Amino acid sequence: MYDGKSFYFEINDIPIYMKGANQVPLDYYPSRMMEKSEIDWIFTSAIEANYNMLRIWGGGMYMTEYYYEMADKLGMLIWHDMMFSCKFYPFKQEAFIETSLIEVREQAGRL
């Protein structure tokens, strides 16, 4: 039972200590950040730092399939924000809610 005195992750009822970083876009030009060599560098750096989790910042971007495949292959956990950050959103507008639901369904299924 959660007592509010600690904060940790559990996977299959096992407490896991997370060590990682917040990943923001590494380049002004997204296409350069999506190159396999850049993605390999991200994961090599994370592993060398003994990280076991990377967080994709909600003000950034969704990564390529290769990124998620590498995370899976290397056992790197990904804490993935949806791309809603640093802005007021029109939550009372039906069109915004509808398009947001589409995005969440598509990305959650992909991730």
Language-model regions, residue ranges each:
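Active-site-adjacent substrate/metal-binding segments within catalytic domains
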Residues: 1-87, 94-111
